[in-house]
Amino acid sequence: MKIRKGDTVIVISGPDKGAKGKVIEAYPKRDKVLVEGVNRIKKHVANSAPERGAESGGIVTQEAPIHVSNVMVIDSDGNPTRIGYRFEDGKKIRVSKRNGKDI
């Protein structure tokens, strides 16, 4: 999976199309990413279950994972781009397909 934690991405399809956010977490085995402020859901939490963002029980709004095919990485110019790879000194470097710069 070419998208990593910390990347800034834009949603290219779905109800949140056009939204930008930072990748909070990546799930490579499921091909999904968790993007800050995108695909927010309401989750009902019991009093005893400590969840992310919940002090006690009730209804919690949090981000849900979104498939990687629905997002694109934003390059240094601020445009959405695909990602390629280049090998330099035996290291794999991610490169923007749009302008050829390192990501």
Curated annotation (Swiss-Prot):
GO terms for cellular component: ribonucleoprotein complex; ribosome. One of its GO terms (biological process) is translation. Keywords: Ribonucleoprotein, Ribosomal protein, RNA-binding, rRNA-binding. InterPro entries: KOW, Rib_uL2_dom2, Ribosomal_uL24, Ribosomal_uL24_CS, Ribosomal_uL24_KOW, Translation_prot_SH3-like_sf. The keyword Ribosomal protein applies. Disulfide bonds: none annotated. Pfam families: KOW (PF00467), ribosomal_L24 (PF17136). GO terms for molecular function: rRNA binding; structural constituent of ribosome. One of two assembly initiator proteins, it binds directly to the 5'-end of the 23S rRNA, where it nucleates assembly of the 50S subunit. One of the proteins that surrounds the polypeptide exit tunnel on the outside of the subunit. Belongs to the universal ribosomal protein uL24 family. NCBIfam families: rplX_bact (TIGR01079). This is Large ribosomal subunit protein uL24. It comes from Corynebacterium urealyticum (strain ATCC 43042 / DSM 7109).
